[in-house]
Amino acid sequence: MSLLIDFIDETEEVKEEYMSLIREVLEKAAQMENIEDGAEVSVTFVDNERIREINRDYRDKDQPTDVISFAMEEMGEGEMEIVGAEMPRMLGDLIISIPRAKEQAEEYGHSFDRELGFLALHGFLHLLGYDHMTEEDEKEMFGRQKEILEAFGLGR
């Protein structure tokens, strides 16, 4: 199983070990979700100010958040699918606030590793079409999240 992950660290404080952890968590999720080899995702690490800006500009929520996902496969009205056999499947972009991840790890009483793995997985599942807007969807997404985290060894 090979997921292509492009990391961008705008904070310049994310250690290689954290990127490796995220890579492994997302590889596990891709395997469990039967995502084909060569699919791509980008993961960008930002500060609270930057994620607040993105949240405001794209989601009309003027506040920092922990993770934002931009799925590439969501087709809007009037959009056409581009078919290319040689093109890798681009799943989308994940944007993670490092300060928010640290705050939440402390708030929830678990490690920064666990919080970072959780946020990356949560965002990744959104890229795959999971959501938590309804009670039923939330149950499905959170159940899958728990399953993957436990399979990886990051359960609570």
Curated annotation (Swiss-Prot):
Enzyme Commission (EC) number: 3.1.-.-
Cofactor requirement: Zn(2+)
Signal peptide start and end residues: none
Domain of life: Bacteria
EC supergroup of this enzyme: hydrolase
GO biological process, one term: rRNA processing
UniProt cross-references to InterPro entries, sorted A to Z: MetalPrtase_cat_dom_sf_prd, YbeY, YbeY_CS
UniProt binding sites for Zn(2+): 122, 126, 132
UniProt key word Lyase: no
Cofactor note: Binds 1 zinc ion.
Subcellular location: Cytoplasm
Any one GO cellular component localisation term in the record: cytoplasm
Keywords: Cytoplasm, Endonuclease, Hydrolase, Metal-binding, Nuclease, Ribosome biogenesis, rRNA processing, Zinc
GO molecular function: metalloendopeptidase activity; RNA endonuclease activity; zinc ion binding
Main location: cytoplasm
Record function comment: Single strand-specific metallo-endoribonuclease involved in late-stage 70S ribosome quality control and in maturation of the 3' terminus of the 16S rRNA.
Similarity section: Belongs to the endoribonuclease YbeY family.
Protein name in UniProt: Endoribonuclease YbeY
Annotated organism of origin: Bacillus cereus (strain ATCC 14579 / DSM 31 / CCUG 7414 / JCM 2152 / NBRC 15305 / NCIMB 9373 / NCTC 2599 / NRRL B-3711)
Protein encoded by which gene: ybeY
